Curated annotation (Swiss-Prot):
Its EC number is 6.3.5.-. Allows the formation of correctly charged Asn-tRNA(Asn) or Gln-tRNA(Gln) through the transamidation of misacylated Asp-tRNA(Asn) or Glu-tRNA(Gln) in organisms which lack either or both of asparaginyl-tRNA or glutaminyl-tRNA synthetases. The reaction takes place in the presence of glutamine and ATP through an activated phospho-Asp-tRNA(Asn) or phospho-Glu-tRNA(Gln). It catalyses: L-glutamyl-tRNA(Gln) + L-glutamine + ATP + H2O = L-glutaminyl-tRNA(Gln) + L-glutamate + ADP + phosphate + H(+); L-aspartyl-tRNA(Asn) + L-glutamine + ATP + H2O = L-asparaginyl-tRNA(Asn) + L-glutamate + ADP + phosphate + 2 H(+). This is Aspartyl/glutamyl-tRNA(Asn/Gln) amidotransferase subunit B. It comes from Nocardia farcinica (strain IFM 10152). It comes from the Bacteria. InterPro entries: Asn/Gln-tRNA_amidoTrfase_suB/E, Asn/Gln-tRNA_Trfase_suB/E_cat, Asn/Gln_amidotransferase, Asn/Gln_tRNA_amidoTrase-B-like, GatB, GatB_Yqey_C_2, Gln-tRNA_amidoTrfase_suB_CS, Gln_synth/guanido_kin_cat_dom. NCBIfam families: gatB, PRK05477.1-2, PRK05477.1-3, PRK05477.1-4. One of its GO terms (molecular function) is asparaginyl-tRNA synthase (glutamine-hydrolyzing) activity. PANTHER family: GLUTAMYL-TRNA GLN AMIDOTRANSFERASE SUBUNIT B MITOCHONDRIAL AND PROKARYOTIC PET112-RELATED (PTHR11659), GLUTAMYL-TRNA(GLN) AMIDOTRANSFERASE SUBUNIT B, MITOCHONDRIAL (PTHR11659:SF0). One of its GO terms (biological process) is glutaminyl-tRNAGln biosynthesis via transamidation.
């Protein structure tokens, strides 16, 4: 394992940005949502039993030959176009040579000096609404590696493990690696810029439909390169690469930590080691991994078993026409249509609820009601289950139906939550649940009047207070009636009946 600089006390962040200019470089690996692998016909299903989605090609057995997945090339071109890149008229695959157990061929088929897309940019919106442009150096295609599973250690890492197992299901899955040019000028906002960039890129890729971008499952993996140079200097410092940061929040935390750590090393007279570093989610720190290789170490050469990729101008223009409205422009348009604040819109986006709310509105629900259900109640249900919001077993159409049941006073808002819970439990459509469970609102005034009289008779002191003009005391009676009707009454109507009975 590479040895890093001695542990030192972290420098205060304000001192870091006063003395040093951070330089970032973001490398994002994206697994494409294709049915089969990059160079063979094996499926790409996540979570399959280990080593059940393999063949001679992705295992690198002698005599096997790769065939390019056209859908992966199409996705790569669309990503490049969405990132404002130039699409190469002549792209070539190359062999990246290195030995590691999760790489069965001892080389990875990637792209080197002739990538599919180059020289683009992505404008990202920061927390205060300002826009920061991140320049893209390249986007290139490659195949993913297998997965090492380290057994017997406390951390799940190789250090301390008794042995390692290898799962080659992931080997050969299509990847796009998107590499930025050095990101300068962010100053103290560098960690925020890093997080905002990955967020914007994730949203863009999802809108394109090329990946599910689930960081927790590894379909979007981020490496953050960080270096520091003294304020006013022009020569970049030595960089480190923090590998596989697997959440948006962690991207920001990892960059901030590495800036503080490097500044402390430099201030103590030490030197930064060019190395990879592991990010620890538990405490937000990084630790040394291995010395960082250079391109020469990989001994790239053209892949002899694959022809170059030469997309025609006509095909590129056809794909350009499929690029949807940018997510951030769409959000701004919808925010204006809804007339909500930046804060409300951030809550919607952070909850992953925007598309779900739009679909619920399209199904007939008012925007405010749709937003309330997805951002509040259903977000909590997703957290309880440990799933993403769009993985809950309820559709926008079903949420819209619940809203309509409340609007028509078939159920009240409290009972509506019970209806949603039954839908989440797989017990049927909302209206059918109301019918089967007897959850319809008690709307018969005579039945409600009887319950009001019972509650008043049981609480004569409160009845006297109401008659004396202390109408706020009616809340106790309303609560008793709601309890007696299992929450299935209209609380506003019950209150009217209570006040009328005491007048």
């Amino acid at each position: 394992m590479a040895m890093s600089a001695p542990t030192v006390e972290l420098m205060d962040y304000a001192d870091v940005v006063a003395r040093y200019e951070p330089v970032l470089g973001m490398e994002v690996h994206v697994e494409l949502s294709t049915a089969t692998k990059m160079f063979c016909g094996c499926p790409t299903d996540f979570g399959a039993e280990p080593n059940t989605q393999v063949c001679p090609v992705c295992l690198g057995l002698p005599g096997s030959l790769p065939v390019v997945n056209e859908k992966a090339v199409e996705s790569a071109i669309r990503i490049g176009l969405a990132l404002n890149c130039s699409i190469t008229p002549w792209g070539r695959f190359a062999r990246k040579n290195y030995f590691y157990p999760d790489q069965p061929k001892n080389y990875q088929i990637s792209q080197y000096d002739e990538p599919i897309a180059t020289d683009g940019h992505l404008d990202v919106v920061l927390d205060d609404g300002s826009v920061f442009r991140v320049d893209i150096e390249r986007a290139h295609m490659e195949e993913d590696t297998g997965k090492s599973v380290h057994v017997g250690g406390a951390t799940g890492r190789i250090h301390g493990a008794s042995h390692s197992l290898l799962d080659y299901n992931r080997a050969g899955v299509p990847l796009i690696e998107i590499v930025t040019k050095p990101i300068t000028g962010a100053g103290e906002r560098a960690p925020e810029v890093a997080r905002a960039y990955v967020t914007a890129l994730r949203d863009l890729l999802k809108s394109l439909g090329v990946s599910d971008v689930k960081m927790e499952q590894g379909s979007l993996r981020c490496d953050a390169n960080v270096s520091l140079m003294p304020v006013g200097a022009s020569e970049f410092g030595t960089r480190t690469e923090t590998k596989n940061v697997n959440s948006l929040k962690s991207v920001e935390v990892a960059v901030r930590y590495e800036m503080r750590r490097q500044a402390a090393v430099l201030a103590a007279g030490g030197a930064i080691v060019q190395e990879t570093r592991h990010f620890h989610e538990s405490d937000g720190t990084t630790s040394p991994g291995r010395r960082k290789e250079t391109a020469e170490d990989y001994r790239y050469f053209p892949e002899p078993d694959l022809e170059p990729i030469a997309p025609s101008p006509e095909w590129i223009e056809e794909l350009r026409a499929t690029i949807p409205e940018y997510p951030w422009l769409r959000r701004a348009r919808i925010q204006q249509e809804w007339g909500v604040s930046d804060e409300v819109m951030r809550d919607v986006v952070n909850a992953g609820a925007l598309d779900l709310i739009i679909a619920t509105v399209e199904a007939g629900a008012p925007a405010n009601e749709a937003r309330s259900w997805w951002v509040a109640y259903l977000s909590e249900k997703a957290k309880e289950r440990g799933v993403a919001l769009d993985e809950l077993p309820i559709t926008p159409a079903q949420v819209a139906e619940v809203v309509k049941l409340v609007e028509s006073k078939t159920v009240n808002s409290k009972v509506a939550k019970q209806v949603v819970d039954f839908v989440l439990a797989g017990e049927g459509e909302p209206a059918a649940v109301v019918e089967a469970k007897g959850l319809g609102m008690v709307s018969d005034d005579s039945a409600l009047q009887a319950e009001v009289e019972k509650a008043l008779a049981a609480n004569p002191d409160i009845a006297d207070k109401i008659r004396a003009g202390k109408v706020q005391a009616a809340g106790k009676i309303v609560g008793d009636v709601m309890k007696a009707t299992r929450g299935q009454a209209d609380a506003a109507r019950v209150r009217e009946l209570v006040l009328a009975a005491c007048s």
